[in-house]
């Protein structure tokens, strides 16, 4: 399995065997770190981290993973990057490609990370775009593998909520690529695009995956092993949009009742974070005062329950990102 010098832009670019190879390497690197016997395989490498969108988990995961492996990083924050403003993506790619061994990009359009990859001459890693979140998918798959006690191709999961963007798109493709039973529970207006659904069905034909899209949240979660969700509204969207989205998605909120509707007493809750699950943030308090909701996409009761594995999931961002970098750059 040769993943050397490979870009990591979206799961559609990889075979099921290649995705599994990343997961196996991540598990191996995680075990080595826990045992204190990690071997540095990226000594002398330098990685540029371009962030057009702010981040906690993605930035920390890339920085810690790189340093664990002996590599250096340069963080280009949103205000410092000239990409697309004073300098074209093509020129930025060619400059950074001369100085760095790899480039991570977290930002808006998928076309930006694809163009970086086209011109950089070094591996480019997608830390998140509007369309895809592939490093999160490796973390999610590793977490499900650790917690399900059975092979991924015998595992079922649901994503409930707004499924139009990177998490809904990516989870649908992940499940299809790995032969899983994947369900999307959302109003039809918030389903992934027809192109993404078609790509998932094409992958499922190869892997035997089962794909379900439904407007019924209870139907989506029936007999699943994992229930995923994500935030319903992005910060900066007007209050009217929040109200409209909350009204549209109220039946898709992850509550103890929805967890119980799975019929699986061992069902686990997953979220890529950050989550609006209580009033302990300025945003959470504003949501409570404005809409009367204590927690939005998930209740505090579920988020803090033993069923919640969100912090295992967050930790696995680092191990899986490390696997992507080691596979591409490691000695």
UniProtKB/Swiss-Prot annotation:
Q: Which SUPFAM superfamilies match?
A: Aspartate/ornithine carbamoyltransferase
Q: Which PROSITE patterns match?
A: CARBAMOYLTRANSFERASE (PS00097)
What InterPro entries would the database entry show?
Asp/Orn_carbamoyltranf_P-bd, Asp/Orn_carbamoylTrfase, Asp/Orn_carbamoylTrfase_sf, Asp_carbamoyltransf_Asp/Orn-bd, Orn/put_carbamltrans, OTCase_ArgI
Q: Where in the cell is it found?
A: Cytoplasm
Query: EC number(s) of the enzyme?
Result: 2.1.3.3
Which GO molecular-function terms appear in the entry?
A: amino acid binding; ornithine carbamoyltransferase activity
Q: What does this protein do?
A: Reversibly catalyzes the transfer of the carbamoyl group from carbamoyl phosphate (CP) to the N(epsilon) atom of ornithine (ORN) to produce L-citrulline.
Family classification: Belongs to the aspartate/ornithine carbamoyltransferase superfamily. OTCase family.
Name of this protein: Ornithine carbamoyltransferase
């Amino acid at each position: 399995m040769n993943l050397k010098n490979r870009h990591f832009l979206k799961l559609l670019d990889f075979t099921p065997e290649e995705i599994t190879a990343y997961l196996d390497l991540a598990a191996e690197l995680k075990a080595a770190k826990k045992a204190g016997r990690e071997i540095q395989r990226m000594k002398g490498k330098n990685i540029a981290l371009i962030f057009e969108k702010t981040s906690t988990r993605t930035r920390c995961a890339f920085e810690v993973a790189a340093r664990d492996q002996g590599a250096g990083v340069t963080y280009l924050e949103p205000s410092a990057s000239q990409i697309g403003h004073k300098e074209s993506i093509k020129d930025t790619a060619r400059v950074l490609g001369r100085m760095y061994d790899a480039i991570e990009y977290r930002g808006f359009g998928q076309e930006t990370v694809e163009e970086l990859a086209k011109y950089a001459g070094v591996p480019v890693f997608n830390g998140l775009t509007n369309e895809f979140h592939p490093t999160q998918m490796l973390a999610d798959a590793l977490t499900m593998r650790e917690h399900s006690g059975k092979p991924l191709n015998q595992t079922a999961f649901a994503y409930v909520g707004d499924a139009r963007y990177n998490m809904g798109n990516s989870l649908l493709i992940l499940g299809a690529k790995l032969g899983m039973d994947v369900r999307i529970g959302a109003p039809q207006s918030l389903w992934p695009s027809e192109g993404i659904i078609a790509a998932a069905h094409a992958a499922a034909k190869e892997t035997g995956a089962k794909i379900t899209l439904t407007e019924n949240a209870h139907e989506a979660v029936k007999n699943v092993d994992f229930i995923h969700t994500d935030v319903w509204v992005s910060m900066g969207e007007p209050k009217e949009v929040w109200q409209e989205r909350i009204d549209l998605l109220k039946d898709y909120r992850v509550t103890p009742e929805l967890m119980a509707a799975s019929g699986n007493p061992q069902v686990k809750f997953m979220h890529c974070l950050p989550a609006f699950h209580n009033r302990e943030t300025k945003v959470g308090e504003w949501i409570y005062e404005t809409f009367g909701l204590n927690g939005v996409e998930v209740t505090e009761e579920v988020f803090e329950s033993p069923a919640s594995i969100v912090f295992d999931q967050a930790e696995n961002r680092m191990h899986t990102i490390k696997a992507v970098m080691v596979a591409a750059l490691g000695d």
